[in-house]
Amino acid sequence: MQRYKVTLMYDGTNFAGFQRQPNKRTVESTLTDVVNKMAKQPDPAIVIYGSGRTDAGVHALAQVVHFDFPFLIPADNMRKGLNSMLPMDMEVLKVEEVAPTFHARYDVSGKQYQYRMDMGEFRNPFKRNYTGHWKFPVDLAKINVALADLVGEHDYTSFVASGAQTRTFVRTIYEATCHIDEANHELVFEFYGNGFMYNQVRIMVGVLVEIGSGTRPVHDVLRLYEVKDRKQARRTVPAAGLYLKHVYYQGEDPQHPTKLPQHQR
């Protein structure tokens, strides 16, 4: 058996998320079907392990999975073979032969997400699957002040949707930035941390655009840490604007080498 690490991108519009679900089209089920077809339907079937889930409508620029294949195929041939059978809304970027101890989920040391928010006065139907929409004027300086409050190790209880399966709401955000993409008239948020929980990025962005528009105090993030109340964060911005940008593994980022502690998963 050879273990392969696969980096892929996908348009999440027509997927019911990453994780396999009965009678629904998901990234995991689509990739699993193709991998097993390449291996001539082995018994037991090949199982795909992802770095984590993405929700329905969320996109990935570089999701990572691993699987064990019953015979050796050169990595680039594996990439070409997968791409020849995958649908048009998925593409394998890279395949690597890895040690049998590598695990796409448990070896993660950090993840980077991007959120794109269209700032047009009117909702653009051509962007509806790829951005959120915020028509109100924003003060980027206020957003950047609030972003600084999100960086560090904190209890993000107020920023996590109900249903999150985690032992604790404490996580560390290493970097949080926002800039305006002038060409596309979009706010672009980026977050890099050792782990993110259910809807966390989408809820944080909802708070940030409200701060930028002046409907929340600039340092309201600090108050939300204290109250630990999801309802007070209010808004969850649409899934369409969220992109999994990069998955880091131990050794890839010497500045932040430590994966999420077991007790925080």
From Swiss-Prot:
rRNA-binding found in the keyword field: no
List of catalytic residues: 55
Top EC category: isomerase
Key words of the record: Isomerase, tRNA processing
Keyword Metal-binding: no
Catalytic activity annotation: uridine(38/39/40) in tRNA = pseudouridine(38/39/40) in tRNA
One BP annotation, GO: tRNA pseudouridine synthesis
GO MF: RNA binding; tRNA pseudouridine(38-40) synthase activity
Entry-linked InterPro entries: PsdUridine_synth_cat_dom_sf, PsdUridine_synth_TruA, PsdUridine_synth_TruA_a/b_dom, PsdUridine_synth_TruA_C, TruA/RsuA/RluB/E/F_N
Positions of substrate binding: 113
EC number: 5.4.99.12
Role according to the record: Formation of pseudouridine at positions 38, 39 and 40 in the anticodon stem and loop of transfer RNAs.
UniProt cross-references to NCBIfam families, sorted A to Z: hisT_truA (TIGR00071)
Oligomer and partners: Homodimer.
Family, as annotated: Belongs to the tRNA pseudouridine synthase TruA family.
The protein, known as: tRNA pseudouridine synthase A
Organism: Levilactobacillus brevis (strain ATCC 367 / BCRC 12310 / CIP 105137 / JCM 1170 / LMG 11437 / NCIMB 947 / NCTC 947) (Lactobacillus brevis)
